[in-house]
UniProtKB/Swiss-Prot annotation:
This is U4-theraphotoxin-Hhn1a. Keywords: Disulfide bond, Neurotoxin, Postsynaptic neurotoxin, Secreted, Signal, Toxin. Belongs to the neurotoxin 12 (Hwtx-2) family. 02 (Hwtx-2) subfamily. Residues 23-47 form a propeptide. It is found in: Secreted. It comes from Cyriopagopus hainanus. Postsynaptic neurotoxin.
Length: 84
């Protein structure tokens, strides 16, 4: 009976430690890859501005609004680039 209880507690402890280590590894990988948050915010702002200005210029020229293609997982919707 004691051996079974010790085995169960050991497995639970290993599971908790493994889960914690996996979460920490994932967080560290996310922080290392890509751009800092401030640069991402600037890129997002540029994409929104870029798409809406493109459509407004085309409308003023009495042409149909051909939405500017957004790249890298973004699409133009309601004159704005939105993440797909």
């Amino acid at each position: 009976m004691k051996v079974t209880l010790i085995a169960i507690l050991t497995c639970a402890a290993v599971l908790v430690l493994h889960t914690t280590a996996a979460e920490e590894l994932e967080e560290s990988q996310l922080m290392e890859v890509g751009m800092p948050d401030t640069e991402l915010a600037a890129v997002d702002g540029e994409r929104l501005f870029e798409c809406s200005v493109s459509c407004e210029i085309e409308k003023e020229g009495n042409k149909d609004c051909k939405k500017k293609k957004c790249k890298g997982g973004w699409k133009c919707k309601f004159n704005m680039c939105v993440k797909v």
